[in-house]
């Protein structure tokens, strides 16, 4: 539990899987310490998806200042680098006001960028990305990992099974620059100074977390998630856009096209939400072992 006496110069980083209660925890903390909240969820960045991404309501934003929520049009992309720039600016402004800052979300790469920095890796030519991707497709993950291992052994060991995108990127960076992605990252300074922040991970029991995931989807439908998906579908946006990869979007869009019943869409969305929560749990367990664990 966070003690009020421990807030003087700290930035609070509150992470956790979807439906773990981290947003409510952050809001409660913000009210207790008169703090301001900064979004660290890659989907809550996008406008028009507040319900589907469980973004803060008007009532919640009235209780404490919120930053970087629903600020990007879904037709646009958004990178870790752009978030880091916006987040560090927001944190500086909050601290200039003499307020504690609370960064909350479920996107592990955002937190890693804050605490470890974001490597200034030179651009990788599209041709090399394609070559690395084709090599992965031709050889399969197991053999591709053996190819990557001498180039970047740390990345090969760190990247989870099935994460094709990160494996391919590590290979392409090493081939293009002659320097491993891990080396680029190691040479990078963190955005937050050591000792200036405190990390917390909300870690509810697995069965309880899954039950929360299931219950929240039904509430989202009641609160207008289908209307949000319908509004974006009418825009004819590219399905590859990051915003349209929000958990539940694909399943509800299929229902709106008449391809599935609402019950089928909900069942599929529940399964995808559980898988997403499991991936998040694994990431935070592996990448933030020293952060304090909170059972909500």
Curated annotation (Swiss-Prot):
Q: Where is this region: Interaction with substrate tRNA?
A: 41-44, 165-169
Q: Which residues does substrate bind?
A: 18-23
Q: EC number(s) of the enzyme?
A: 2.5.1.75
Residues the UniProt record annotates as site (Interaction with substrate tRNA): 107, 129
Keywords of the record, alphabetical order, are: ATP-binding, Magnesium, Nucleotide-binding, Transferase, tRNA processing
> What is the reaction catalyzed?
adenosine(37) in tRNA + dimethylallyl diphosphate = N(6)-dimethylallyladenosine(37) in tRNA + diphosphate
Does this UniProt record's set of keywords contain DNA-binding? no
The membrane-spanning stretches of this chain are none
Annotated ATP binding sites? 16-23
Subunit details: Monomer.
UniProt protein name:
tRNA dimethylallyltransferase
Per UniProt, what is the name of the gene that codes for the protein in this document? Answer: miaA
């Amino acid at each position: 539990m966070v003690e009020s006496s421990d807030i003087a110069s700290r930035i609070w980083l509150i992470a956790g899987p979807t439906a773990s209660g981290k947003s409510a925890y952050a809001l409660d903390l913000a009210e207790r310490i008169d703090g301001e909240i900064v979004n660290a969820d890659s989907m809550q960045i996008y406008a028009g998806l507040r319900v589907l991404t469980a973004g803060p309501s008007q009532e919640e934003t009235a209780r404490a200042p919120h930053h970087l929520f629903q600020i990007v049009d879904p037709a646009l992309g958004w990178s870790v680098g752009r978030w880091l720039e916006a987040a560090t600016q927001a944190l500086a402004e909050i601290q200039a006001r003499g307020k504690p800052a609370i960064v909350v979300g479920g996107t592990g790469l955002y937190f890693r960028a804050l605490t470890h920095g974001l490597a200034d890796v030179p651009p990788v030519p599209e041709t090399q990305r394609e070559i690395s991707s084709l090599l992965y497709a031709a050889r399969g993950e197991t053999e591709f990992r053996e190819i990557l291992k001498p180039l970047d052994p740390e990345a090969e060991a760190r990247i989870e099974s099935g994460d094709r995108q990160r494996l391919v990127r590590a290979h392409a960076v090493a081939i293009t620059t002659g320097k491993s992605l891990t080396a680029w990252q190691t040479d990078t300074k963190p955005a937050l100074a050591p000792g200036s922040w405190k990390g917390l991970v909300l870690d509810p029991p697995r069965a309880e977390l899954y039950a929360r995931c299931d219950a929240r989807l039904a509430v989202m439908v009641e609160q207008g998630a289908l209307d949000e998906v319908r509004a974006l579908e009418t825009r004819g946006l590219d399905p590859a856009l990051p915003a349209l990869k929000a958990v539940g979007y694909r399943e509800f869009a299929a229902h709106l096209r008449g391809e599935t019943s609402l019950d089928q869409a909900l069942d599929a969305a529940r399964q995808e939400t559980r898988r997403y929560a499991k991936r998040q749990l694994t990431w935070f367990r592996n990448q933030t072992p020293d952060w304090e664990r909170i059972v909500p």
